[in-house]
């Protein structure tokens, strides 16, 4: 067993190897504060046959024992990964994937199991560092190591791995990963932070990453295994030459077709023709012929952009595709927006619910629920394909979370807008950057629904083609540029600053110059898109949809909650039955009343106010007789509150029998004459009758005399 440690932000990171999971290719027990994550990395001995990609799998396993919880439900064990676990797995996958040899086809599986959680020390960051350590110590050919940190900013001061208390005050949540030389991955949510400040935060994080990488290099020198020799996929040089000679300029001409579907059809036609022509000369090598064609396609696109400064669809480097904006296209939904950018189209729908509709979270974090959520769907027809539809995959969950994070800073607080908000983005057409189109569509549907968002938000995806020291930054990348390029850098924000960032790259890092130019170009594009959106809808609708619930909030004394609910829910169920509203009661006394009919909601408010009102001595009430005894009648003066009219207080004259004056169900006006020490209410009908007795004929009442003067 060997143990290595270093300090990060005043807390000790300890990497232990050689004690746990020794049969894995590489394994470490990573501890940061009281957060402990077991990370293993294992590679298959032989390449997987018949594939043209690198089969890397990253699993992030949350164990609820890490926070002292027993899983809910009947089975009482962890089930499918939570959304947070999927996002954490993606966070680990993205910076390590570009760092394996080209042509490496062996299966590699990284498993990060969270075993103990200290809320001040993020387990996903520990898992990321642990994954790099496990791969670097193993015999798997990994070209790392990498480091990862969380950057926050409180009162203008940048912080590494902020504590939970600091994170609550921070105006950014920025995850940075990279090698000692360059940034590999960025994932951020921010509260309208200027682009220049985001660059500073990224580079600040990278300085700490360089320390973490140096620490791992020292560790590998002591405890690392020799890297195994693995066969890398090689193409027959004769086959490659034959393909290139046969294709000539055919592929270049096909690539320069500006329409996606026509271009794809033209490219497929060239590929089919080439395969049919060369397969007799190179039997059983169809896959390799297609691989060479794919390589040529990538080379042509990259040369067009970097040398000829021409994009496949003819746009300039910073030109954005034609934009179309529509709102309110679905009649019965609470809000809807259709955002179209070129051949990318997203329909976003906003649904408003009550506080009872919020999402309950059962994970390792301290957050137990959320009232704003965004879900993203990517059906196969959006790209003209067929495939089974079996629920959201990792990509869809990641895109939904990114769009959710982009809008979070502008969502009104619960006090300002007491609704649960669900957004759903349907990517109905895709040619690149549907996640950023989802951000734009979200703004449209929120404003169409009448949600008082603080500012509109738009998003844009930037691309990069880098050849040596030369690079080109592309605005609003389409599918081909994303697939064949080196970077997908998504930026969302308002006119005043960035609210979300996500950067994935396929090369071994990007520097400050590239990041700066990409963010500056993204801002220009974002403002252009915002102008197009605001020309159609420039502020939230004044009136909500008639099909959306109207929510009225009120507060009562928490001690009176039981009076509103009643025994076995009798009182509250009666209110719901009478008014048709939906009622949610919080422990602090806040009551949310929801109804599509405002008058019904107001009626429920009046009933609750009467239930929680205190009966006052000397005040006159009108109520119904509920019970008759031989000594008097009980009258309900307020809902759930009864008082007694003693037989002697029923009338001015002597009453022999209670039923001679009142019967059950009669409405009577009474005055509260006493509330005794036991809380019993004594009423008088006699006092009311006396007060209402006509004045003596011929005389003037004092109040009338006053009015005469």
From Swiss-Prot:
This is Polyribonucleotide nucleotidyltransferase. Its EC number is 2.7.7.8. GO terms for biological process: mRNA catabolic process; RNA processing. Mg(2+) binds at residues 482, 488. Belongs to the polyribonucleotide nucleotidyltransferase family. Gene3D superfamilies: GHMP Kinase, N-terminal domain, K Homology domain, type 1, Nucleic acid-binding proteins. Keywords: Cytoplasm, Magnesium, Metal-binding, Nucleotidyltransferase, RNA-binding, Transferase. It comes from the Bacteria. Involved in mRNA degradation. Catalyzes the phosphorolysis of single-stranded polyribonucleotides processively in the 3'- to 5'-direction. PROSITE patterns: KH_TYPE_1, S1. The keyword Acyltransferase does not apply. It catalyses: RNA(n+1) + phosphate = RNA(n) + a ribonucleoside 5'-diphosphate. It comes from Heliobacterium modesticaldum (strain ATCC 51547 / Ice1). InterPro entries: ExoRNase_PH_dom1, ExoRNase_PH_dom2, ExoRNase_PH_dom2_sf, KH_dom, KH_dom_type_1, KH_dom_type_1_sf, NA-bd_OB-fold, PNPase. SMART domains: KH (SM00322), S1 (SM00316). The gene is pnp. PANTHER family: POLYRIBONUCLEOTIDE NUCLEOTIDYLTRANSFERASE, POLYRIBONUCLEOTIDE NUCLEOTIDYLTRANSFERASE 1, MITOCHONDRIAL. One of its GO terms (molecular function) is RNA binding. Its main location: cytoplasm.
């Amino acid at each position: 067993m060997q143990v290595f440690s270093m300090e990060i932000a005043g807390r000790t990171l300890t990497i232990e190897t050689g004690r746990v999971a020794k049969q894995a290719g590489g394994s470490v027990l990573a501890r940061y504060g009281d957060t402990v994550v077991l990370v293993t990395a294992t590679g298959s001995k032989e390449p997987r046959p018949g594939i043209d990609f690198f089969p890397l799998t990253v699993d992030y396993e949350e164990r609820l024992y890490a926070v002292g919880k027993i899983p809910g439900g009947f089975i009482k064990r962890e089930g499918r990964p939570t959304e947070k676990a999927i996002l954490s797995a993606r966070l680990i996958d993205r910076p390590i994937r570009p760092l394996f040899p080209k042509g490496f086809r062996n299966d590699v599986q990284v498993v990060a199991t969270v075993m103990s959680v200290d809320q001040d020390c993020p387990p996903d960051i520990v898992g990321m560092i642990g994954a790099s350590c496990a791969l670097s110590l193993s015999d798997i050919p990994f070209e790392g190591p990498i480091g990862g940190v969380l950057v926050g900013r409180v009162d203008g001061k940048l912080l590494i791995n902020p504590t939970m208390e600091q994170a609550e005050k921070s105006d950014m949540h920025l995850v940075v990963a990279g090698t000692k030389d360059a940034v590999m991955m960025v994932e951020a949510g921010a509260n309208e932070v200027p682009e220049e400040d985001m660059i500073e935060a990224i580079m600040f994080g990278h300085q700490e990453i360089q320390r973490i990488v140096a620490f791992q290099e020292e560790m590998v020198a002591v405890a690392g295994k020799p890297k195994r020799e693995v066969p890398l996929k090689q193409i027959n040089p004769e086959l490659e030459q034959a393909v290139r000679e046969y294709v000539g300029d055919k592929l270049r001409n096909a690539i320069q077709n500006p329409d996606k579907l026509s271009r794809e059809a033209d490219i497929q036609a060239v590929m089919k023709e080439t395969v049919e022509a060369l397969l007799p000369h190179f039997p059983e090598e169809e896959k390799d012929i297609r691989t060479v064609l794919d390589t040529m396609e990538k080379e042509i696109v990259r040369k067009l952009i970097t040398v000829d400064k021409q994009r496949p669809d003819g746009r300039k480097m910073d030109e954005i595709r034609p934009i179309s904006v529509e709102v309110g296209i679905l009649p019965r939904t609470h809000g809807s927006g259709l955002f179209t950018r070129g051949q990318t189209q997203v329909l976003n729908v906003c649904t408003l619910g009550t506080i009872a509709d919020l999402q309950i979270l059962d994970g390792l974090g301290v957050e137990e629920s959320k009232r704003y959520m965004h879900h993203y769907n990517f059906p196969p027809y959006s790209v003209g394909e067929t495939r089974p539809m079996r629920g959201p995959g990792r990509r869809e969950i990641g895109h939904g979370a990114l769009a959710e994070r982009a809008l979070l800073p502008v969502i009104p607080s619960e006090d300002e807008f007491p609704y649960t908000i669900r957004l759903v983005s349907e990517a109905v057409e895709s040619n690149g950057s549907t996640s950023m189109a989802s951000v734009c569509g979200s703004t449209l549907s929120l404003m169409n629904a009448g949600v008082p968002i603080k500012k509109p938000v738009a998003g844009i995806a930037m691309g990069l083609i880098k050849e040596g020291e030369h690079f080109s930054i592309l605005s609003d990348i389409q599918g081909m540029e994303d697939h064949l390029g080196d970077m997908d850098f998504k930026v969302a924000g308002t006119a005043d600053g960035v609210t979300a960032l996500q950067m994935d790259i396929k090369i071994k890092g990007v520097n400050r110059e590239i990041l700066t130019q990409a963010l500056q170009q993204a801002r220009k594009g974002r403002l252009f898109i915002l102008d197009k959106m605001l020309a159609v809808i420039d502020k939230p609708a004044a009136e909500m949809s008639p099909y959306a619930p109207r929510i009225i909030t009120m507060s009562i004394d928490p001690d009176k909650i039981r009076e509103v609910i009643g025994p076995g829910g009798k009182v509250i169920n009666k209110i719901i039955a009478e008014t048709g509203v939906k009622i949610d009661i919080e422990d602090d006394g806040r009551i949310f009343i929801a109804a599509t009919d405002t008058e019904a909601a107001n009626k429920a408010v009046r009933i609750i106010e009467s239930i929680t009102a205190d009966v006052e001595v000397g005040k006159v009430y009108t109520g119904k007789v509920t019970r008759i005894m031989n000594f008097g009648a009980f009258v309900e003066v307020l809902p759930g509150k009864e008082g007694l009219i003693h037989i002697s207080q029923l009338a001015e004259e002597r009453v022999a029998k209670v039923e001679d004056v009142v019967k059950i169900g009669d409405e009577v006006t009474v005055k509260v004459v006493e509330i005794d020490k036991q809380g019993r209410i004594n009423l008088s009908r006699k006092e009311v009758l006396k007060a209402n007795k006509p004045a003596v004929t011929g005389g003037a009442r004092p109040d009338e005399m006053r009015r005469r003067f």
